[in-house]
A protein has these predicted regions:
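Extreme N-terminal starter segment of soluble prokaryotic enzymes
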Residues: 1-3
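Short acidic, Gly/Ser-rich segments with clustered Asp/Glu that frequently serve as metal-coordination loops
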Residues: 7-20
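Metal-dependent phosphoesterase signature
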Residues: 63-86
């Protein structure tokens, strides 16, 4: 089964290469959305959770990107521990974890698992990054060869249109799943030497 997920956060890490155990380095989780698909590419479970901020506020610069303010998170959010346990339960069924720029999302979730002392199988499940695996498919010129496509660029390349709600975790995870299944169906992943 495929577990797609996306996070929205309080910002960016101070150091991108810091270990997950450097909890001061990694931003806090603001929103977590995930979709679990079976082997027939049918959605079987999903969640979209805003997290109640504990001992932090959401900076204006971050809420300007994803639209979630501290006030909104306090009013609409759920407890982080509950969200992590729910995601961990979904991981129990997953054969693959898939995200766009998965190395970032994995560190955000991993740091939150450590902060809450919640055990998870995050490190053990094989991962697929729709950003890094599609660089040579999108072929967007960058400073040193092709650049990593953002999710909107990948969606545009595959479907000839963007998608609504970019930087909302649910909209992003739906777009990521759509892109993955289109890549798989069209055979583009086989051409790139992927597992699919």
């Amino acid at each position: 089964m495929y577990l797609f997920f996306d996070t929205e956060t309080t910002g960016l890490p101070k150091k991108w290469n810091a270990p997950v155990t450097d909890l001061d380095n990694w931003p806090r989780l603001v929103q977590l959305a995930w979709l679990l698909y079976d082997s027939r590419n049918q959605e079987i479970k999903s969640a979209n959770r805003i997290i109640i901020p504990e001992n932090f506020t959401i900076p204006t610069e971050a809420s300007d990107v994803h639209g979630i303010t501290t006030e909104r998170a306090l009013a609409e959010g759920i407890d982080l521990y509950e969200a992590l346990n729910e995601f961990s339960s979904a991981m129990d069924d997953a054969e693959y974890l898939i995200a766009h720029n998965i190395s970032f999302d994995e560190m955000i979730i991993g740091a939150e698992f450590l902060r809450k002392d919640v055990k998870s199988q995050l490190a053990e499940i094989p991962k697929i990054c729709t950003m890094k695996t599609t660089t040579n498919i999108c072929k967007i010129p960058g400073r040193y060869g092709y650049k990593w496509p953002n999710l909107t660029e990948l969606h545009q390349h595959l479907f000839h249109k963007g998608f609504d709600g970019a930087h909302d975790a649910l909209a992003d995870v739906i777009a990521c799943a759509d892109c993955f299944f289109e890549l798989k169906k069209s055979g583009m992943y086989q051409q790139q030497g992927s597992l699919f």
